[in-house]
From Swiss-Prot:
The gene coding this protein: E7
Species per Swiss-Prot/TrEMBL record: Human papillomavirus 36
Domain remark text: The E7 terminal domain is an intrinsically disordered domain, whose flexibility and conformational transitions confer target adaptability to the oncoprotein. It allows adaptation to a variety of protein targets and exposes the PEST degradation sequence that regulates its turnover in the cell.
Key word Heme present: no
UniProt name for this protein: Protein E7
Modification note: Highly phosphorylated.
A Pfam family annotated for this UniProt entry: E7
Locations listed in the record: Host cytoplasm; Host nucleus
Keyword tags: Activator, DNA-binding, Early protein, G1/S host cell cycle checkpoint dysregulation by virus, Host cytoplasm, Host nucleus, Host-virus interaction, Inhibition of host innate immune response by virus, Inhibition of host interferon signaling pathway by virus, Interferon antiviral system evasion, Metal-binding, Modulation of host cell cycle by virus, Oncogene, Transcription, Transcription regulation, Viral immunoevasion, Zinc, Zinc-finger
């Protein structure tokens, strides 16, 4: 280095002295990105799920089985509904409820 300020020309990197096992990597590898049509097909693929949920009444211990066909996004949204504001009712508890709040 000549002078008080470092310039790019003064910096010399020799990786072979620091770590001999470090080799340059070809960043243009043979990897291919999937085309957009394939991604859309995967997103719209519907799978059959069996959902087991408890009855929404506090005094009932019935387990309800529901079979649905949904995408991965759809089943996750359904799961969020069931663990949030939406509750399924068994036929007996449904008969004891008033419909529509009336």
């Amino acid at each position: 280095m000549i002078g008080k300020e470092v310039t790019v020309q003064d910096i010399v990197l020799e990786l072979s002295e620091v770590q001999p096992e470090v080799l340059p990597v070809d960043l243009f590898c043979e990897e291919e990105l999937p085309n957009e049509d394939t991604e859309e097909e995967l997103d719209t693929e519907r799978i059959v799920f069996k959902v087991i949920a408890p009855c929404g009444c506090s005094h009932c211990e019935v387990k309800l089985r529901v079979f649905v066909q949904a995408t991965e996004f759809g089943i996750r949204a359904f799961q969020q509904l069931l663990t949030g504001d939406l509750q399924l009712l068994c036929p007996e508890c449904r008969g004891n409820c008033e419909h529509g709040g009336s």
